[in-house]
């Protein structure tokens, strides 16, 4: 159960890649685990997963890439005796094919989705700072996930 929930969290970060009222920035992505650490404590479990992702945009506006790579790190906490996480967060960093940088932060939601926003960027990404997205894992399997994301503003 913890792996499924963590995979769900992992699939949500790229949702922040585009927003600011731009419904065209919906898309999907894949995340492959590159590192995973778990800390067991008396009160619960803390997990950290780093993934190498590819984000593919359905209909990017002119000047934006159709796809880009990202490195994401996700954290979650599950209290002892619980099946669902009590919380989680994630951060992604990406450099697009043109060399522009973007950073995203997200928080796990109670419905299993991940709410993300663009926190900063350079070049074309500066116009999207503050844009919000929602992501949901479509498939999770053996250290990888496939997810969908769409803007919420």
Which sequence ranges carry the predicted segments?
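Positively charged n-region of N-terminal signal peptides that target proteins for export
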Residues: 1-4
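Beta-strand-enriched cores of mature, soluble protein domains
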Residues: 20-153
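N-terminal signal peptide c-region/cleavage motif recognized by signal peptidases
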Residues: 14-16
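Sec-dependent N-terminal signal peptides
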Residues: 7-8
